[in-house]
Amino acid sequence: MSEPIKPRIDFEQPLEPPQEPVLRANVAFDEQQAEHFFPAAPELQQEEEEGRAEGIINAALKPKRSLWRKMVTAGLTLFGVSVVAQGVQWVHTAWVQQDWIAMGGGVAGGLIVFAGVGSVVTEWRRLYRLRQRAEERDVARELLHSHGLGKGREFCEKLARQAGLDQGHPALQRWQASLHETQNDREVVALYAKLVQPVLDNQARREISRSAAESTLMIAVSPLAVVDMAFIAWRNIRLINRIAALYGIELGYFSRLRLFRLVLLNIAFAGASELVREVGMDWMSQDLAARLSARAAQGIGAGLLTARLGIKAMELCRPLPWLEGEKPKLGDFRSQLIGQLKDTMKKSDNKAK
């Protein structure tokens, strides 16, 4: 049976033709602008947002230079100059009057002052070296998006010297053998990041893994909370020192405090959401909360926090930014910590039996 014919439909207005999209006028780039042009990447935008937010936190926590602080600084400077001038006059008077005891005291005081000035200069140099590492990361980030020639190799060779790698190192030789004259700065730095930089990164990963495992086992078996806190603090400071030394940074007192502050600030900025996202689902899936004791769970948490501290220290001490897929995650250390803790618990149960 055939379908009935549909009635005719009359439109009150005529159909309008489809409108073509309005295109913006073309823009011509010169050679200088084209050299610095690179496509937008979501991960780069995320890094810029994180850096901007971290800068806001740093600015908020940094004490403002008030008038009273400037007056105190000027007063201390004037007092120091007066002490030095008085010491010089004292030594001169003792020399004229042949008061050898007073002269010996003045010389001893002068040696102490010179030693203090030398310590301040050394601390300033180490602190400047830590700040210079952040500038080197910015330079490396620019070179990774540059199409120029000639700057990448010189920059990478300087990084190799800072890391203490001699010309006979196998990784450095592989990198030099892979270079060609036609490669631009981006390709040269990327090759260095893939062939040479992992040598130091793997050593830092082993340090983080060992410190995290020691923190986990210590918290799991120790009955004293005060001992736990002291041990974790000592291990974390030692971990930061060793990671900084691996990347060629010599830490002094103030530079160590600054690096530790930056690490804690970075962790606070990232928040606990990343820790919950990477660890929480795995713990729930394996039902570890039902099988591990409270002390064991605290040990795993302390170990993961130590690992996170080490990862952030790596990020601040590395001369190169992380490439895609290179940044270590807590999941890389999670299974190892859980396995070591389970083995320790099994051994303790067997000894008890």
UniProtKB/Swiss-Prot annotation:
Gene Ontology CC entries for this record: plasma membrane
Membrane topology classification: Multi-pass membrane protein
Principal place of residence: membrane
Compartmental location: Cell inner membrane
Name assigned to this protein: UPF0283 membrane protein Spro_2618
Stated family: Belongs to the UPF0283 family.
Disulfide bonds listed in the record: none
Transmembrane feature ranges: 71-91, 101-121, 214-234
Record keywords: Cell inner membrane, Cell membrane, Membrane, Transmembrane, Transmembrane helix
Higher taxonomy: Bacteria, Pseudomonadati, Pseudomonadota, Gammaproteobacteria, Enterobacterales
Signal sequence extent: none
Organism: Serratia proteamaculans (strain 568)
